[in-house]
Structures are given as structure tokens and as C-alpha cells.
Amino acid sequence: PAGSTFGEYPLEVNTGNLNPDYKTVLVLKLKSSSPGSTIGAQYDTLKITFVGCLSLLDGNYSVAITSAGLTAVRTNEVVTLTDINTFRTRYVGRYTLGTFSPAGYTFIDICDEISLPKNQTLGGYSNKVYGTSFYGDGIDGIVTSETTFEVVHNIAFADGDQKQTYLYTRL
């Protein structure tokens, strides 16, 4: 219907032959079947990611956070599982605990490729926290071993966005 921002489409996928160790992406290009109706450009591509690998990144870490040429090391970082393969950190940027509420930032790990969901802000402020695709298209971080992972994202400020680089090491 006019003005709608979503629609329904039944889709059955037999996942039996998908690789359980790597993500499989199904890309659908949407077109209207009703005369006179259109699909906005921002909605014309639908990506569905099938994941066989469950992420185990939740836990306690030491993290080195670098931005604006300075590095802060936090030895009490806690990465919390909030949903399937979705996590929330305790720290964002080099800021101390309690600076923002909610604290930290959210990321998703799909088969050792980390991405930041859109529309994150710095605590209750309007500053956007967003991915940079530093490691490839849509990839804002990588899991480098069973005990380490890296993330790069930006925080938007009025005087210019600031790159944040994190190196997490499991304790």
C-alpha cells in the first residue's frame, strides 16, 4: 500500500547444502508487480545472510583504543552477547566508563567479519558511531584468532569525524 515502508513476501530456502563455516548471502533485487507503484531506491535490494558459524566473542578483554594519535588501554572491557552473533562493548572511543549511557557500541560478527549496525549514536548524544568498511565492503573489523579481534569505526563530531581503532585481546 502507498506510504508503506515494508511488505511481505514468502520465501522458502533449503539451507541443507549451504557451507556451515562461511556466510552465504542471497541478494534479491526487488521490482514492483503493481502498475503505478514503485520501490524506493533505498529499498530495492534485499540481502539475506545465512550463517552457520556461531560467534563466541563474548567475554573479558583488554582493549587498546587509538584515536587522534592517542592510545588508551582498558583491561576491564566486557563484550556482552545481546542477540545471536550481536555484541555490545563497555567502552566507545577513549572515553571513560560512565561518560555515556548507554555505554559502548554494538557490533555483529558473521563468520569472523565484524560490522556495525546503522543508526548508532554516542550514548544519548546525536554523534553517530558508524562503520568505515576498513577491512572491505561492509566489514568494519575482523577476528584474527581465537583470542583477538580488531574493529575500526568513526565517531561523528561537528569539527570532523574521528577514526577509532580497537585491538581486543581476551583475558
Regions found by a protein language model. Name each.
Residues P1-F6:
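Short proline/glycine- and polar residue-rich coil/turn motifs
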Residues G7-S32:
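Contiguous beta-strand segments of beta-sheet-rich domains
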Residues S33-D44:
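Beta-sandwich strand segments
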